Amino acid sequence: MEFSVAHPAVKAFMCGSLSGTCSTLLFQPLDLVKTRLQTLQSGVQPGTGRVGMVTVFVNVLRTEKLLGLWRGVSPSFVRCIPGVGIYFSTYFTLKQRYFSSGAPGPLQAVLLGAGARCVAGVFMLPVTVIKTRFESGRYRYSGVFGALRSVCQTEGPKALFSGLMATLLRDAPFSGIYVMIYSQTKHLLPPEISQSSYAPVANFSCGVLAGVLASVLTQPADVVKTHIQVSPDVFSRTSDVVRYIYKEHGLVGFFRGAVPRSLRRTMMAAMAWTVYEQLMAQIGLKS
């Protein structure tokens, strides 16, 4: 099938997948550092020295060398390339179906972003579980497919969907908030900027602002999700993780890893949306 005659949703999928590839490769180290920071909570007792982002970063370089920062990039690719594609194609389809006559309002933008993320999140959750375990450093899998086989044999297929509720509680609000802020701030741009050669830079800046706010608001759900997926034998329910984190580390425990996650999610989302919109414009489709 030639690209020029492909269905618009297929084109949106391809543009989204390409944008996801670029952003994932660039910002994978931040995701690894975020995961290590969050999973360190299990082994750090209250009152001990604080382990920060720089400490984890240096430790990875010392023990696993430079390429260690890209540990887990294979499952990240397996997740993000189709995952981002599914997200953008779903978003495009929903927007064309319900808002083809005009731009969605703030609440409608939230529903669009959250709905598209839920669809992509459910489809890609098994790979998300494997990616999180790869990055944690606690598991020694031979590869993505070896990890899938190992989990199914030792824990059952159900383990591949561990943290589903926490993942949706994190990703759906993040995407909804992000799309709402991103779309509304873009509308505030004057025409001389939004219609000029500086539009990609301006759009990226809007994406950064939206990403920071959305990341901070959804950080607690990300911490809970990571604990469930890394230690499914210890935490069987979301409420168990919430009680554990609060008891051992207080409210601050829910924001462990916030800096690297905010950096990564913000930069990845801003880049993915900017690249996606530029690619869609190049092929004559309104994103």
Swiss-Prot record:
Deletion consequences: Fishes lacking both slc25a38a and slc25a38b display anemia.
Single GO cellular component term: mitochondrial inner membrane
PROSITE patterns: SOLCAR
Catalyzed reaction equations: glycine(in) = glycine(out)
Gene3D superfamilies: Mitochondrial carrier domain (1.50.40.10)
Record GO terms (molecular function): glycine transmembrane transporter activity
Highest taxon, organism lineage: Eukaryota
Each Solcar repeat, start to end: 7-97, 104-188, 198-282
Tissue: At 24 hours post-fertilization, expressed predominantly in posterior blood island, posterior cardinal vein and circulating blood, as well as in somites, brain and retina. At 34 hours post-fertilization, becomes restricted to posterior blood island and circulating blood.
Keyword DNA-binding set for record: no
Record-linked InterPro entries: Hem25/SLC25A38, Mit_carrier, Mitochondrial_sb/sol_carrier, Mt_carrier_dom_sf
Coiled coil: none
GO biological process: erythrocyte differentiation; glycine import into mitochondrion; hemoglobin biosynthetic process; hemoglobin metabolic process
Residue ranges of the TM segments: 13-38, 72-98, 110-135, 163-186, 202-228, 257-275
Subcellular location: Mitochondrion inner membrane
Record function comment: Mitochondrial glycine transporter that imports glycine into the mitochondrial matrix. Plays an important role in providing glycine for the first enzymatic step in heme biosynthesis, the condensation of glycine with succinyl-CoA to produce 5-aminolevulinate (ALA) in the mitochondrial matrix. Required during erythropoiesis.
Protein name (Swiss-Prot/TrEMBL): Mitochondrial glycine transporter A
Organism, scientific name: Danio rerio (Zebrafish)
